Regions:
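Cofactor-/ligand-binding subdomain signature composed of acidic, glycine-rich
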Residues: 1-41, 62, 70-72
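Cofactor-binding active-site loop characterized by glycine-rich and histidine/acidic residues
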Residues: 33, 39-201
């Protein structure tokens, strides 16, 4: 699957965005049918969020990190972090880490994450990858984590000892992106996170 182009706005890139959005919508529709017919476990899907997530994907660069929620499948498809095949492997709880790299079938569907370690236990070069912190189920809980991720970038800019840690940060220039739903934006965690990011200047 091709990924969404970051800065190119030609006919082909717009059509590619449309294709990704269309595939994501139909993955949601098919996934819901599979759940309602009893062929797959509990399902949560991202239909209706496609356009906003395609826009976010165009702004997202290597080294950036996502702290999101369970409706972000279009974004994950657009950045090549997930695919329709991996999405359905997760829906069916496939225990194969190659088929379902987010959690090897241990999480509910729509719970995405990228691996920060190689198979041998060494760190992956996060500055060269599109990163996603692992999603958790309590809605709104991605926001306090977003505070930590954004504050870490500030520390990488300002603390000399951290500048020597290669591979984790591009001198604090990465951006932490957060996504949240309407209901969760009314929770205390959301407002406390907004306040904390302001106080910490993160």
């Amino acid at each position: 699957m091709k990924t969404a182009a970051a800065e190119v706005w030609d006919r082909d890139s717009v059509l590619e965005d449309y294709r990704i959005g269309w595939e994501s919508r139909h993955a949601s529709l098919l996934g819901r049918k599979e759940v309602l017919s009893g062929k797959a476990k509990f399902g949560i899907f991202g239909d209706g969020k496609e356009v906003a997530q395609l826009a976010m994907a165009r702004a997202f660069r290597k080294g950036d990190v996502r702290s999101g929620y369970y409706r972000d499948q279009t974004f994950m498809f657009a950045k090549g972090i997930s695919s329709v095949e991996k999405f359905f492997a997760q829906l069916y709880a496939t225990p194969d880490v190659d088929a379902e790299p987010s959690s090897a079938g241990r999480s509910m569907n729509g719970h995405f994450g990228t691996r920060f370690l190689n198979d041998d236990g060494s760190w992956r070069p996060l500055v060269d990858e599109f990163n996603s912190s692992a999603d958790v189920s309590p809605t709104g809980s991605q926001m306090p984590r977003l505070v930590g991720l954004s504050y870490a970038s500030r520390l990488y800019r300002e603390v000399d000892a951290m500048k020597e840690l290669a591979g984790f940060s591009a001198h604090g220039s990465e951006i932490a992106f957060g996504t949240i739903g309407n209901a969760s934006a009314a929770e205390g965690m959301f407002w406390e996170s907004v306040n904390a990011i302001g106080v910490l200047r993160a």
